[in-house]
Amino acid sequence: MVLFISFQNYKGDKIFCDDTVAVAYNNTYYIGEVQKIHGDKREVEIKFMKRARNGYYSWPKKEDVDTVDVDFIFYSNVLLVGAGKEGGGYVDCEEDIAELFDKYKNDYM
């Protein structure tokens, strides 16, 4: 039996395992991949990427994994284009993410 657990994020999008998402932290945001969903707590485990340059993201040498409340996920279905040699890729919608983060920040931070 396969159990699909999902939650809705800030925009109302459903969040699933393996989704690439943007997460609000303090006065900035980070891009990462949902690794695990803790259905009983509205929390997800996310493996974060590092910002390399102008919209490019890659996986850090040392894994950066954290458990995050779904309320901090403000953008889901982030599309990574053209994965590089270290994985990751270019975030095609970086301007949209930044704009929505500003709105999120004004509403919640």
Question: Predicted segments — roles?
Answer:
Residues 28-38:
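Short beta-strand-centered aromatic/proline hotspots
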Residues 1, 40-42:
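Long, low-complexity acidic tracts
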Residues 43-109:
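Epigenetic mark-reader domains in eukaryotic nuclear proteins
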Residues 12, 27, 54-55:
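Intrinsic-disorder/low-complexity loop/linker signature
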Residues 1-17:
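Mixed-charge, Lys/Arg-rich low-complexity intrinsically disordered regions
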